[in-house]
UniProtKB/Swiss-Prot annotation:
Localization, UniProt: Cell inner membrane
Main location, first listed in the record: membrane
Entry GO MF terms: L-arginine transmembrane transporter activity
GO cellular component, one term: plasma membrane
Entry similarity comment: Belongs to the LysE/ArgO transporter (TC 2.A.75) family.
Source organism, top-level taxon: Bacteria
Topological type in the membrane: Multi-pass membrane protein
Protein name as annotated: Arginine exporter protein ArgO
UniProt cross-references to Pfam families, sorted A to Z: LysE (PF01810)
Keywords linked to the UniProt accession: Amino-acid transport, Cell inner membrane, Cell membrane, Membrane, Transmembrane, Transmembrane helix, Transport
Function of the protein: Involved in the export of arginine. Important to control the intracellular level of arginine and the correct balance between arginine and lysine.
Reaction(s) catalysed (UniProt annotation): L-arginine(in) = L-arginine(out)
KW Electron transport (keyword) present: no
Amino acid sequence: MLAVYLHGFILSAAMILPLGPQNVFVMNQGIKRQHHLMSASLCALSDIILICAGIFGGSALLSRSPLLLALVTWGGVAFLMWYGWGALMAAWRGDGVASSATSVTQGRWRILVTLLAVTWLNPHVYLDTFVVLGSLGGQLLPDIRPWFALGAVTASIVWFFALAFLAAWLSPWLNRPVAQRIINLFVGGVMGFIAFQLARQGFGL
């Protein structure tokens, strides 16, 4: 059982660690110390749902529906371009962290919607959880499959909360105006690059 658990943990960690929209978003919220634990919780919860769905049968749905994958891909491209453009504009204007209570309240809902979009409109999430984890986990015997899923879920939870806490710890150094401008440029560049890669996949290039 332990070997199966570790297999799921290591495989999931290997797919989560590369820089992606979720990691960038959680890192940015941690640096701002603005609902970063909520962001980590939502990312982990979304991963739990997707990982379990993929391992326990959802992978077949995605593999049999090219139209669904295309819709998710182009929805993701549009969203990432919009989000990346917003980050670049924030860097250009030198926007800082909202300080008023009203702004924080509005920010909570905006963070919630944005994070759900970053997660659920990202085709790579479905490929990782449904295709890779789902295919491998689906080949295991039913009695040990939950251990594989538990290992994969554990890696996701550990990673997102570690990222949020680390970013918050570094916040005093990274939350300065110059650093925020650099981070916004970085976020905009990453989102634009991922959108470009997704568009290439969508066109089959």
